[in-house]
Amino acid sequence: MSEPQNGRGALFAGGLAAILASTCCLGPLVLVALGFSGAWIGNLTVLEPYRPLFIGAALVALFFAWKRIYRPVQACKPGEVCAIPQVRATYKLIFWIVAVLVLVALGFPYVVPFFY
């Protein structure tokens, strides 16, 4: 029996795509801040050409998560996860946390020159 879709997968995909989209710029700064160093950190820039694809994937995943999480309660069948108010509130909170993280990750390459 298949598990009902509840938006969790789309949230995960959006967060992962945002992380991948900012790896070329945010990754080296985080690694240096954590004490890692070396010439290999510069190799993370090879992901820069794929950044638009990762951004698109993040935005599409967030759209589908939003569509799934903010659907009317009447669209949920009784007994489904989306019919439980506490679960709906938790998913909405997680959605907005992931959305903020995606926006930070997408905007970080434009702010990073101020840190160097």
Curated annotation (Swiss-Prot):
Keyword annotations: Cell inner membrane, Cell membrane, Membrane, Mercuric resistance, Mercury, Metal-binding, Plasmid, Transmembrane, Transmembrane helix, Transport, Transposable element
Signal peptide, first to last residue: none
A cellular component term, taken from the record's GO annotations: plasma membrane
Localization per record: Cell inner membrane
Pfam families: MerT (PF02411)
GO-annotated molecular function: mercury ion transmembrane transporter activity; metal ion binding
Domain of life: Bacteria
Parts of the chain that traverse the membrane: 16-36, 46-66, 94-114
Disruption-associated phenotype: Mutation decreases resistance to mercury.
Membrane topology: Multi-pass membrane protein
Keyword Isomerase listed: no
InterPro entries on file: Transprt_MerT
UniProt binding sites for Hg(2+): 24-25, 76, 82
Keyword Metal-binding: yes
Job description of the protein: Involved in mercury resistance. Probably transfers a mercuric ion from the periplasmic Hg(2+)-binding protein MerP to the cytoplasmic mercuric reductase MerA.
Annotated family: Belongs to the MerT family.
Protein known as: Mercuric transport protein MerT
UniProt source species: Shigella flexneri
Taxonomic classification: Bacteria, Pseudomonadati, Pseudomonadota, Gammaproteobacteria, Enterobacterales
Gene coding for it: merT
